[in-house]
């Protein structure tokens, strides 16, 4: 079974009604996923039929190496195409960070929007916790997910209970769940 990951189906860049000349794009980034953890990449002990089906229908990128092996930096590199240090995103942000990926950076979702795509990000953002650094201000039409990882919240087993709750956001507001 896959380790408990903060399954980051974030960066699912989607298009609802695609022009046949343009493909739909779904980009999946998962923290701490090893090459042997998904069936389509050779996992024998872990069954991942849904991911395997997606891989069969699309393009599998087999050689993405993160610029730094931490959440924030790898996301920044994927979104910008730049080394994390170039965009000021080395290391990992936490719940007290008041900086993040500068909204003036040119990002993949901004480029896709310029070409008429609708964009969305689902999962962990981890590129800035204040509203002006949020996913909607970085080129995503929709965002539903966490601003940072659960190891920066009171739900993490080794952290003090006085840590703030980890909010689930819809856009820039705390999600109302029924």
Name each region found by the language model.
Residues 1-9:
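Bacterial N-terminal signal peptides that target proteins for export
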Residues 8, 12-16:
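C-terminal segment of classical bacterial N-terminal signal peptides
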Residues 2-3, 15-178:
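Formylglycine-dependent sulfatase
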